[in-house]
């Protein structure tokens, strides 16, 4: 949220208002340095203030990251999906968070560096199964760094695919 970002910037010692943060984000979007996604599940008023932001280039994002691996992975997926689906691309957050949701393609996508940890595996797959209960989703996908498998859970199929293979297919 804008307030959260204002608080983060304020911790650096800079005095900045929420309105200034909103202006800067609008300028950055207007100059194509990054783009935003709306929460598909949000009410109309919240769609403006509750967005996720992605850099248009992973090189720019890499300048600001301390631990870049997962963020870079999610950002490259966002860039690729944005090119393909443009304004049809959303994220979904309502009791669960799904990284990317494309209602017209009936596709829900999670991005995770690895599913080797059981807690991560459960979080990512449960979110996909939950969105499939409330939305018309036919394809459930987890994009990872280098893992590949098909998970059968609750009568649904979740495809796990490495980023390199997914990028070649899109």
Model-predicted regions and their roles:
Residues 121-134:
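Short, charged, amphipathic alpha-helix that recurs within catalytic cores of restriction-modification
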Residues 93, 135-154:
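Nucleic-acid nuclease catalytic cores
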Residues 146-170:
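Domain-level recognition of nuclease-like catalytic cores that cleave nucleotide substrates
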Residues 1-108:
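Accessory nucleic acid-recognition modules appended to NTPase machines
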Residues 54, 109, 141-143, 159-161:
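Hydrophobic/aromatic beta-strand patches that form the interior of the parallel beta-sheet core
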Residues 105, 111-120:
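Short beta-strand-loop-alpha-helix junction that forms the active-site gateway
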Residues 84, 134-135:
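Alpha-helix C-cap/termination motif
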Residues 98, 117-120, 149-153:
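Short active-site-adjacent structural elements
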């Amino acid at each position: 949220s804008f307030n959260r970002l204002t608080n983060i910037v304020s911790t650096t010692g800079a005095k900045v208002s929420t309105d200034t943060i909103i202006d800067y984000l609008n300028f950055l979007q207007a100059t194509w340095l990054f783009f935003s996604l709306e929460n598909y599940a949000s009410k109309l008023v919240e769609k403006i203030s509750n967005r996720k932001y992605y850099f248009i280039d992973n090189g720019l994002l890499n300048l600001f990251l301390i631990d870049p691996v997962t963020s870079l992975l999610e950002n490259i997926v966002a860039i690729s999906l944005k090119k393909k689906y443009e304004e049809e691309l959303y994220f979904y957050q309502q009791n669960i968070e799904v990284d990317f949701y494309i209602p017209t393609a009936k596709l829900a996508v999670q991005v995770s560096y690895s599913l080797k940890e059981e807690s991560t595996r459960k979080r990512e797959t449960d979110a996909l199964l939950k969105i499939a209960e409330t939305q018309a989703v036919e394809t459930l996908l987890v994009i990872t760094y280098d893992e590949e498998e098909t998970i059968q859970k609750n009568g649904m199929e979740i495809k796990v695919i490495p980023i390199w293979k997914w990028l070649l297919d899109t």
